[in-house]
Amino acid sequence: MTKTFRNPQLTKNGELKHLLSIEGLSRDMITHILDTASQFVSLSDSDRDVKKVPLLRGKSVFNLFFENSTRTRTTFEIAAKRLSADVLNLNINASSTSKGESLLDTINNLSAMSADMFVVRHASSGAPYLIAEHVAPHVHVINAGDGRHAHPTQGLLDMYTIRHFKKDFTQLRVAIVGDILHSRVARSDIHALTTLGVPEVRAIGPRTLLPSGLEQMGVRVFHNMEEGLKDVDVVIMLRLQNERMSGALLPSAQEYFKAFGLTPERLALAAPDAIVMHPGPMNRGVEIDSAVADGPQSVILNQVTFGIAVRMAVMGIVAGNSD
């Protein structure tokens, strides 16, 4: 008898109860998240007196960041508070996990404190899946980045940003540039872009920083920056993740910038109205020139702003679905 595989992110009715990866989400589901996020963008308006909605009132959200983060943790905290949730940020270095307590023991103890949602960043790929399999049916898990595997909310906010500026995914050429081998953002972006119907996704980088199997994912591979950027509509720059590299994969940061840094001259090879994105943190003078990062085609700060609304949408959607 054939065993039926069920996506662990979904309820029996196919609704989103956890967000663990963009892989496996339908185009309709991704579009629903983006549409929901658009309703929350107005809450960020500086002219708005009331910036909260009561969607998660009475719910407890635990931010569990086992890796350092500023941008992601802060935007999740703001998102949860704007949904009226009670938020607890666990200080991992001061917690029992640094004294040898297992991940699941930590989850059990926090669940006993009536946690309703865990937002998890972990160095081990698959850690959020393990937690999602372990928690009670009413508890929700959102992956805020696991190892090299996935960063689904970053992928979704990138798609929101692209849709905001470019409207139609089916008419775009998108280039992802840099350390794709170690990038969970790149994996999430590629799955989202192909699911949303982008006809041409390009990966640009040195051979040592591009994983095998990109072509099987429908990605065109370039090892020359000038060739890869020609006529693209969106450029997504990635930082060098030196903390995940084992061994000398590059000669030097200066040599990398010389070959793959995004300069105004190289950006001129893209479409005239191309936008430049970066998930952060940026390494100026390594993967991107300051003139580009701060230039008129950069939408990097828009990504940060939209990230709050997208994370509000994800939290609101999963909180409404349980088995």
Swiss-Prot record:
Q: Name one GO biological process term.
A: amino acid metabolic process
The reaction(s) catalysed by this protein are:
carbamoyl phosphate + L-aspartate = N-carbamoyl-L-aspartate + phosphate + H(+)
Give the pathway: Pyrimidine metabolism; UMP biosynthesis via de novo pathway; (S)-dihydroorotate from bicarbonate: step 2/3
* Catalytic activity, EC: 2.1.3.2
GO cellular component, as recorded: cytosol
Q: Where does carbamoyl phosphate bind?
A: 71-72, 121, 151, 154, 280-281
UniProt similarity note: Belongs to the aspartate/ornithine carbamoyltransferase superfamily. ATCase family.
**Record HAMAP family:** Asp_carb_tr
- This protein's name: Aspartate carbamoyltransferase catalytic subunit
On assembly, the entry states: Heterododecamer (2C3:3R2) of six catalytic PyrB chains organized as two trimers (C3), and six regulatory PyrI chains organized as three dimers (R2).
Top enzyme category: transferase
The UniProt function text for this chain reads:
Catalyzes the condensation of carbamoyl phosphate and aspartate to form carbamoyl aspartate and inorganic phosphate, the committed step in the de novo pyrimidine nucleotide biosynthesis pathway.
Annotated binding of L-aspartate, by residue: 99, 184, 239
Name the PROSITE patterns for this protein. CARBAMOYLTRANSFERASE
- What InterPro entries does the annotation carry? Asp/Orn_carbamoyltranf_P-bd, Asp/Orn_carbamoylTrfase, Asp/Orn_carbamoylTrfase_sf, Asp_carbamoyltransf, Asp_carbamoyltransf_Asp/Orn-bd
Q: Which organism is it from?
A: Cupriavidus pinatubonensis (strain JMP 134 / LMG 1197) (Cupriavidus necator (strain JMP 134))
Gene Ontology MF annotations: amino acid binding; aspartate carbamoyltransferase activity
The record lists the lineage as: Bacteria, Pseudomonadati, Pseudomonadota, Betaproteobacteria, Burkholderiales
Q: Which UniProt keywords apply?
A: Pyrimidine biosynthesis, Transferase
